[in-house]
Regions:
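Membrane-water interface regions at transmembrane-helix termini and the short interhelical loops
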Residues: 1-6, 120, 124-132
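Membrane-interface coil-to-helix junctions
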Residues: 23-121, 162-165, 169
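Start-transfer (signal-anchor) and selected internal transmembrane alpha helices
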Residues: 1-37, 48, 139, 202
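Glycine-rich, flexible loop segments associated with nucleotide phosphate handling
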Residues: 14-17, 45-47, 105-109, 193-208
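Membrane-interface starts of transmembrane alpha-helices
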Residues: 8-15, 102-113, 134-141
Length: 219
């Protein structure tokens, strides 16, 4: 069999990209398995945290803003909300697709969030593996994160409506940006006397900082 086409970067990158996409779809499909038991029931599987996250989304959709103080807890004083708003805003975006169809439809919509964010870990892990090794390492890393069990899998299931998956995704995205920065700057001379040598450090520094900030905004 002639594999000469593999020497063509266009075809090689297309095939590898297609495999990454396929693994991502498989990761999402696995995480959507609980849908059959949850859709239309108005139920979720993450305990009380899921219901409080739902409250934050409902308040955001109703008022247009994230509440920084919760008057309904620590009675009679209330208390500050100490974690970031990013997961709530992402979930509210999904919730908008439910329209004005009621609370059950909203729950069905936001229940997609952990599954989608969990599946997005596949391309992130692929690029980390590819940069640290090669494309085969990247595919193995993506496949591993798609099917690995334990806490990561359970917290990325449809209906496990909690913010931990967002913490994992954005902190791993920070690692990717950091690794890319180190790899691209390896062996390059950086000097304050040569402004052009500062371009790449600034670009990767900013990207890493943004990814780090996004992870903090989910914690």
């Amino acid at each position: 069999m002639d594999f000469s086409f593999w020497n063509n970067k266009k075809y090689r990158y297309g095939i590898i990209g297609g495999v990454v996409l396929l693994i991502t779809v498989i990761a999402l499909a696995i995480r959507l398995l609980p849908m059959g038991d949850l859709v239309g029931t108005g139920d979720m599987i993450a305990g009380p945290d899921a219901w409080y996250n739902l409250r934050l989304v409902e308040v955001l959709l109703a008022s247009g803003g994230f509440i920084s103080f919760e008057a309904m807890t620590l009675f009679p004083y209330g208390q500050d909300i100490v974690w970031g708003p990013l997961f709530t805003y992402i979930s509210a975006f999904f919730g908008m697709f439910a329209g004005d169809a009621g609370r059950t439809a909203l729950i069905d919509a936001v229940s997609w969030v952990p599954a989608v964010l969990g599946a997005l870990m596949v391309p992130v892990m692929f690029f980390i593996g590819k940069k640290l090794g090669d494309w085969k390492t990247g595919l193995l890393a993506g496949l591993f994160i798609a099917v690995v069990g334990g806490q990561f899998f359970s917290r990325t299931l449809y209906g496990h409506f909690d913010h931990h998956v967002a913490e994992t995704l954005f902190s791993t995205l920070f690692v990717l940006c950091y690794v890319l920065g180190l790899a691209n700057l390896n062996g390059k001379e950086i000097s304050l006397k040569n402004p052009s040598s500062l371009k790449l450090p600034l670009i990767f520094g900013v990207l890493s900082g943004i990814a780090y900030l996004l992870s903090l905004l989910t914690m």
